[in-house]
């Protein structure tokens, strides 16, 4: 597995492992908050996750949103710009059936990269619109 393939795959495997446990928990907005909280807790148990010069260091929930914070590793040459990394990460997550299910259940994702080299911050939000999920 190449480094470029790793960020989404690691997270997607985490998401797959909890889907069976959580699929009965989320019926709509009220339970979507609980689902987001559990999702963030499960991701947090496996942190840090490193890939391509970036490290996922934090996962937390806020309402129905799972917020993930990624930092660029200082002193390490990244293989992708933060924007390119986020685009690739978004594409991989949106293509995953488990992530699609979570989004369909009302969960949104907010992914932030804090670039320690430049001090810049990059952010992507994953929801029905950005992932192209048509409401049933």
Question: What kind of region is each of these model predictions?
Answer:
Residues 10-15, 78-84, 115-121:
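Short, intrinsically disordered, charge-biased short linear motifs at domain edges
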Residues 21-24:
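C-terminal motif of bacterial Sec signal peptides marking the signal peptidase cleavage site
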Residues 33-77, 102-136:
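Polar/charged, Gly/Pro-rich intrinsically disordered segments
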Residues 26-29:
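Bacterial signal peptide processing site
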Residues 2-12:
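Bacterial N-terminal signal peptides that target proteins for export
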Residues 78-102:
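Short, non-transmembrane amphipathic alpha-helical segments
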């Amino acid at each position: 597995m190449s480094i470029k393939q790793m960020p989404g795959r690691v997270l997607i495997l985490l998401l797959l492992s909890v889907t069976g446990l959580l699929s009965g928990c989320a019926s709509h907005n009220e339970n979507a908050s609980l689902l987001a909280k559990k999702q963030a807790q499960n991701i947090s148990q496996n942190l840090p996750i490193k890939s391509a010069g970036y490290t996922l260091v934090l996962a937390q929930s806020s309402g129905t949103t799972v917020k993930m914070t990624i930092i660029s590793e200082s002193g390490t040459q990244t293989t992708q710009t933060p924007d390119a990394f986020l685009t690739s990460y978004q594409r991989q997550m949106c293509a995953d059936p488990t992530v699609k299910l979570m989004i369909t259940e009302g969960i949104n994702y907010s992914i932030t990269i804090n670039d320690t080299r430049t001090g810049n911050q990059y952010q992507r939000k994953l929801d029905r619109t950005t992932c192209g999920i048509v409401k049933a």
